[in-house]
């Protein structure tokens, strides 16, 4: 127990005080605003995905003045039908405060991260931030495993648990009290804690950064215990099993059970010890894979449920964890459908006068694009209908033609960029077709013309924004095979500059 306490307190030695005054600094809200607009290449800005950009320094100054006047109840009023001062909706001020909170609470953790990199080569760890860095790991490890636990991570049953966890890292009582007040008065919290949707409610787009940080920190606390137990599994489980064995000898009344347990003692220990266990997480989903038996996976399943409910007060249910076999199950993770498929090959072996033909089946990770959910995401963004028929984008008709083409072309390139690791890239042709024809319909609507006449007038130059895609990038990365376009289209490439999933590709 003392070792466990030292493990938990190891990373908490750098607590930060006096975070509350930062909430009244204008540059904090500027940082929060810039965070949403300066993402990596695959992430579109808020304007591209039709989110309103309402940030201004004048609004921030008025918000800070109102906070100095201690009129928080007015700012966080639940009545969304009324307008706050100068015609701005109160929801805007609530969202700005949450963005400021998100920047401030990240400061202690950012300082701890910087200090951990002191004296180390940070450049080598940057690539590990990419979402695509997970898939090379899956290609190396998953092909040798048998079963997988598909886990929907639960969320805390009460928001006070989030504040209590932060008390271990932040000692500014004023900031924590204001944080608690904000959580209780925040008008969207009831919708964030409901279970009416299958999606984890803490990942809704509105004020996502703030609640996502609180949720990830809560999960981090539970995972720290889990990883500690995993690292110490050999010692802890062996000790526990030996104690149980001594107890059976002490009672000594069930002779048959004594003999069976003694003979299969090493087998029982193997059921608990699994050196081929792998675990990774993204958003509200985690994957645990193993080479062990289904019995071992069931033990891990109920162990996680009891750990969440009894020690961390997560609202968890066993049906949120599914045990599947990798050979006949598609893993829905990070926008891909991944599965392990045997790749048969024939090897001819010549030994003197005898020749042998050997059939070999090597497991291979198969990653495909979930075309139906992706079309549904495009339909939600008003690029097509639910059946995949392209439609125009009326909201963009006020923009210049070059901006419209640039927006559609950027989204098309980003989709190709993210799904460059797909095993079957032909499924992307339909997505590109939807975006190209939606762009043509938008331009034709703007100029009050038909799509056919508009395309005839522009000719092939119209498609240049869409055609400069993966082929040219791959020919630069893989010059040796650039002459073979057929082989080039089958190559899977994972990029290390993707740190966030585009909203169109976030199918969770």
From Swiss-Prot:
MF terms (GO), sorted A to Z: RNA binding
Subcellular location(s) of the protein: Plastid, Chloroplast
Any GO CC annotation of this UniProt entry: chloroplast
Pfam families: Intron_maturas2, MatK_N
One example of a Gene Ontology biological process annotation: mRNA processing
Keywords: Chloroplast, mRNA processing, Plastid, RNA-binding, tRNA processing
Gene giving rise to this polypeptide: matK
Role of this protein: Usually encoded in the trnK tRNA gene intron. Probably assists in splicing its own and other chloroplast group II introns.
Annotated protein name in UniProt: Maturase K
Broad class of the protein's primary localization: plastid
């Amino acid at each position: 127990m003392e070792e466990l306490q030292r493990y938990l307190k190891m990373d908490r030695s750098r607590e930060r005080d006096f975070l509350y005054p930062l909430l009244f600094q204008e540059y904090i809200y500027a940082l929060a605003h810039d965070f949403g607009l300066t993402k990596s290449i695959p992430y579109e800005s808020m304007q591209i995905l039709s989110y309103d950009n309402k940030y201004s320094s004048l609004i921030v100054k008025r918000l800070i003045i109102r906070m100095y006047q201690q009129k928080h109840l007015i700012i966080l009023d639940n009545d969304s039908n009324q307008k706050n001062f100068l015609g701005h909706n109160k929801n805007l001020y609530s969202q700005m405060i949450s963005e400021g909170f998100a920047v401030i609470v990240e400061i202690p953790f950012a300082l701890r991260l910087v200090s951990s990199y002191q004296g180390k080569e940070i450049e080598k760890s940057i690539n590990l931030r990419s979402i695509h860095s997970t898939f090379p790991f899956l290609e190396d490890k998953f092909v040798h495993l048998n079963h997988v636990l598909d886990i929907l991570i639960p969320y805390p049953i009460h928001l006070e648990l989030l504040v209590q966890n932060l008390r271990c890292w932040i000692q500014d009582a004023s900031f924590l009290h204001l944080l608690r007040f904000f959580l209780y008065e925040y008008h969207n919290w009831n919708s964030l804690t409901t279970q009416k949707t299958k999606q984890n409610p803490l990942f809704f787009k509105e004020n996502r950064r703030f609640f996502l940080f609180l949720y990830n920190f809560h999960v981090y606390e539970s995972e720290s215990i889990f990883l500690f137990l995993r690292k110490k599994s050999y010692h802890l489980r062996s000790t526990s099993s030996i104690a149980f064995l001594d107890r059976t000898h002490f009672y000594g009344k069930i002779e048959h059970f004594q003999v069976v347990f003694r003979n299969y003692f090493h087998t029982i220990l193997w059921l608990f010890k699994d050196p081929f266990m792998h675990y990774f997480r993204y958003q509200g989903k985690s994957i645990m894979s193993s080479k062990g038996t289904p019995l071992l996976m069931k033990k891990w399943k109920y162990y996680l449920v009891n750990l969440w409910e009894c020690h961390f007060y997560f609202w968890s249910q066993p049906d949120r964890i599914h045990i599947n076999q990798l050979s006949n199950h598609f893993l829905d993770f990070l926008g891909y459908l991944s599965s392990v498929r045997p790749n048969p090959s024939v090897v001819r072996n010549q030994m003197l006068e005898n020749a042998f033909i050997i059939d070999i089946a090597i497991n291979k990770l198969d990653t495909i694009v979930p075309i139906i959910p992706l079309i549904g995401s495009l339909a939600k963004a008003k690029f097509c209908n639910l059946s995949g028929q392209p439609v125009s984008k009326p909201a963009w008709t006020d923009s210049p033609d070059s901006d419209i083409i640039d927006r559609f072309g950027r989204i098309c390139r980003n989709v190709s960029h993210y799904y460059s690791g797909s095993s079957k890239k032909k499924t992307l042709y339909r997505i590109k077709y939807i975006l190209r024809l939606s762009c043509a319909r938008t331009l034709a609507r703007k100029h009050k013309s038909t799509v056919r006449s508009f395309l005839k007038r522009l000719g092939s130059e119209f498609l240049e924004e869409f055609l400069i895609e993966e082929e040219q990038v791959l020919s630069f990365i893989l010059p040796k095979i650039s002459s073979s376009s057929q082989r080039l289209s089958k190559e899977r490439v994972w990029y290390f500059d993707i740190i966030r999933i585009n909203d169109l590709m976030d199918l969770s």
